[in-house]
């Protein structure tokens, strides 16, 4: 169900990225009680942030999480848009 929700959310996501996002959602205890749509979105955002941006490097350099999120938001939205996602990051995402 999460895989189907993810494909509706991000129809152009590459297959290897899709599997990583789905695996993250399935393995996350916190997402196990979420709806498939919510689990797909939260896993997708976390995957893109931690895997495809400089977010973790910014944290290592001493930026707080909110600042690091701000600096990677535009890149994340570019990736999400390229994968066919219509939704954009909200300030709390």
What label would you give each PLM region?
Residues 42-80:
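Amphipathic alpha-helical packing elements
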Residues 20-45:
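Short basic alpha-helical hairpin corresponding to helix-turn-helix/winged-helix-like nucleic-acid-binding
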Residues 3, 23, 27, 54-56, ...:
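Acidic-enriched, low-complexity/disordered segments with a strong bias for Aspartate over Glutamate
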Residues 84-93:
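Short, charged, intrinsically disordered terminal tails
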Residues 1-25:
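Membrane topogenic helices and adjacent juxtamembrane segments
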């Amino acid at each position: 169900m999460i895989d189907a929700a993810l494909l509706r959310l991000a129809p152009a996501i590459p297959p290897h990225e899709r599997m990583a996002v789905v695996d993250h959602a399935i393995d996350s205890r916190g997402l196990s009680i979420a709806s498939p749509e919510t689990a797909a979105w939260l896993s997708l955002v976390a995957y893109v942030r931690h895997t495809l941006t400089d977010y973790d490097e910014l944290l290592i350099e001493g930026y707080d999480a909110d600042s690091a999120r701000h600096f990677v938001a535009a890149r994340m939205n570019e990736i999400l848009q390229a994968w066919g996602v219509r939704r954009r990051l909200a300030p709390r995402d």
